[in-house]
């Protein structure tokens, strides 16, 4: 996608320094566009935990390179396994991270230690390229849903969509998951409008999704997190579409905190609730998401403080709660499959159920 007319991926290896990677510092959006250089496993881990890089597919791709960096001086099995465990622990909820590391470890253990760094770069590059192709396919399948809504409306007015958090191109290597169909619909000439949940406490909707959509020229409106139900109740939402950090084998969906409340409101108002995801986000080893998906607890400061621009246009942080008030900060919640209209994957759409997922991924029936 583009920033100021220039095409970027959210992660790349510069041609003149192929032993490092570049990412955007997502904690600086939208006020500043800053590029970070990462060239060692510690820097990669810090970027993931600090959320300078975020989004389930993207952190998996970044971690893949981090594993290669860790092997520069010692490519033994012991070093490989130690680095893999270190990286997997950085964000416990997003399954793409574990998926990417497990894929890398399997590939690297198949070659001699002296060949692992070179083979690792090839595999990490492949993960990135595949992510772009997968997300483009998700976009095409989701676009069909938006077309259907537009046609049902007699091609009158606009298609109103609601999204939560950020599942756009900066959350993946390119295109995004939940936003990919929206970009394609807009580019096709379908008049879409997006209600953008602010997504407290880190405001990834108001800061990141709104910035992405605005940069692409997509009409949108930022709303308070608690306003979504009202807009659904008053007939101003045609479809909810979100991304996810982990989907279980029976279709439960872990996503940014607050997603479950949107699903409840959508269910109560007969608004379709769709989840867009690459197959790398499916955890075939877990069935009950509420019981078995670990939920990351982040710093209370993310709830107690807020960052924004002051009247002079300077970025700053202010406390928004009393000095003696504690805060809790679960980063994710789980939406039960019964509240999900369907899943949009690179292979097509399906019901949020074990049967639905296996209809698209029959090879997993035998594997698990």
Swiss-Prot record:
Any idea of its EC number?
Answer: 5.3.1.23
Site (described: Transition state stabilizer): 165
Which pathway does this polypeptide act in? Amino-acid biosynthesis; L-methionine biosynthesis via salvage pathway; L-methionine from S-methyl-5-thio-alpha-D-ribose 1-phosphate: step 1/6
Residues the record lists as binding substrate = 54-56, 91, 204, 255-256
Record: active site: 245
Determine if rRNA processing is one of this entry's keywords: no
UniProt entry keywords in alphabetical sequence: Amino-acid biosynthesis, Isomerase, Methionine biosynthesis
Q: Which organism is it from?
A: Gluconobacter oxydans (strain 621H)
Please give the name of this protein: Methylthioribose-1-phosphate isomerase
User: In the record, what lineage is assigned to the organism producing the protein?
Assistant: Bacteria, Pseudomonadati, Pseudomonadota, Alphaproteobacteria, Acetobacterales
